[in-house]
Amino acid sequence: MAVTDDLRRRMHHEHRTLRVLQEDLLDRFESFCEERSSERHRDFVGVFEDFRASLQRHFEFEEEGGYMQQVLDRRPHHKTKVDMLQREHREIRVVLDRLESELATDLTEDLPRCDDFKKDFVDLMTRFGRHEQAERELVMEVFWLEGGVSD
């Protein structure tokens, strides 16, 4: 099964969009950590919501008729890896929902809650980075390395 140019373009666009939003989110997070003001909190929340929405669309693209199905169609033996990545999607969504609830309140006045949020946010970004790396490695292996060499 060939990977269409449309699918490749969409994969590239999805990942580029997430990368740009993640960089902006990390910048806003750093600014908020430097100065816990209501203005910086609002700025961070706005970008967090954009990142969360984009990530949700990205996960849906992968899961529902997106390229993870093509991974399985092409290489069914990768089912365990795909299942793990999809399980991580659910787990990341749970953390995003929890952090969004935290952000709905002003964290600037509650130092212990703010510190807990910071730790949880850093953990999320680390986990997301590892998830994306595992996903890229799988996609490269299936669509480009295996497809270009062993088909």
Task: Enumerate the predicted regions with their spans.
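Small-residue-biased structural context
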Residues: 1-151
